[in-house]
Amino acid sequence: MILHGSILRTLGAGLVLASSVLLVTSVDAASPPASVVKTLNLSLPGPFNGCTVLDSGATPTTNAILDLLRPSAFLTTTNDNLAGEGGAIASAELVSLSPETVVYTIASGQHWSDGASFSGIDLVSWWLRAKQLASIQSDGYRDIRSLAETNAGLTVTATFSQPYAEWNLLFRDVEAIGTPAGCSWSSFLARPSLGPYDLVSATDNRFVLVANKDWTLDPGRFGRIVISDSSTIPASPSAYFASYSLDVTSATVEAVSAHPSVSSHIGTSSENAEITFAPSRPLTKVLALREALSLILDRQSIINDIYGSVTFSPAVAQSSLYSQGQAAYPGGNGSAPSAQSTTTTVPSTQQTGSLNDCALCAVNLFEKFDYIKMPSGWFSATGARLSLAVAVGPTALDQAVAVQVETQWRNDGIAVTSLNVRSDDLAAYKAASNEVDVAIFTRPTTTTASSSARSFAGPGYLDSYPSGVRSGALTELYTTSVSIFNPVTAQGTWLKLDQDVMNEFWVRPLFTAPSLVEWSTAIGQVYGSFSVPGLVDQVTGWGIVQPTSQG
């Protein structure tokens, strides 16, 4: 079951250490002797790359693997919140709101794998690198006015020039000072590590990690991890195996069912399938026509055709910022509760003047703008065919969604030409820059709505999944939300921005993709997760379940 909760805004060293002690105790009690090195085979979505988290090519899988190899102030929990790691960065505490001030404490005696000391200078170097990027990764870092080292580099004080409530997103997967950026394997292998694991080898589809003997947290963790992009379950029932996948089909579920030594969990993911419209194309710049193109689609039918109604049927999306299953998601769980693996579908309703799918409403809107339905399709009063140019993202999910959407549009008399692009953010850019009318892609959500909302406020960097849409109202909502430190209060403002974007039909959210987590029944303390980092960040707390004696 996926749990919910609010983002942790502060980190107390005592609390983190207490949590770590409790976790270690429970793992140790069920773990084999320390002299026995246990290997975990971990399957994650690939292909892999050698990026740092600040590089544009970084993926959720990249970030998750780096969580095991680099110092972080906060990591992702199973319920999509953030919690302090309590490792090399021992604590991070918000000590003042005016001006916003955060104090980072570095654990003493920490060294990178090349022997160099880890200290506050590494955080300063990371800040200087991050704040200059033309990327949303620079958000927050650009708001830091100064970063001061004290206590022989073991204390770093960040003073902000303006409020930034998402400060717990900063200083994650920090690289050593002077290390090269970029995604090449040569650059990656040249960077030292500092975390619960050290790197042995890395390729496009395989990582090998070994436990860092100097890492004192989680002593019962696996001694070796082999990470691959193969979802094949090991033939040996004694092998320790876990995986995270977005490939949720009848075939994959049946395959898991055939392995009694493997447990599984079907839940929601952090991947939202969506349609976005170009802001200045002749057709899509008109609100009523964006609305018609949105309402004419039967989203539940799209879901049913992709996933069927037996294994898992996601509910029609009710948010452009949140994934279904996140605590702040505005809709109900619908037909996709995170705690069960089989669901029933919910038919779409047809209500005029709402966000619900409504083919009749769409027809009325087209006719209101003098479009005429002919046997060969829709035509304007001047005889121009109603046609759309569509950019489609590269993933299997993108392609499956595009087939369904384009088929429905064609069946409704709308001509469609399709262009496949190399990345999801590039698909968004194609629509934002008015090269196409529509983009169909999958947008990842994170622990905060600010990442999704960046499409509509601030610099339109490529990795913001740019929309090309800017307005004073949306910018004000974004600026207000990101400066509110109370997560409950901030949520209300984020939801207002969310609703405004959907009411203007700049985005037509379709659904949140399901995810499948699998693991050997011999592994204890495994929980379902919304995201790849949410699963991988659990790994250090997993232990081996000892068989119970009978009799």
Where are these regions (language model features)?
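N-terminal lobe/hinge region of extracytoplasmic solute-binding protein
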Residues: L42-L97, T105, L128, P192
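A bilobed periplasmic-binding-protein/Venus flytrap-type ligand-binding module shared by bacterial periplasmic
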Residues: V210-K213, S231, G267-A292, I296, ...
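Aromatic- and charge-enriched surface segment that lines or borders ligand/interaction sites
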Residues: S91-S135, G153-T157, L283-K285
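Surface-exposed binding/hinge segments that line
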Residues: V103-T105, I136-C183, V200-S201
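Ligand/substrate-recognition segments at binding pockets and active sites
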Residues: D204, T345, T349-L355, F369-T442
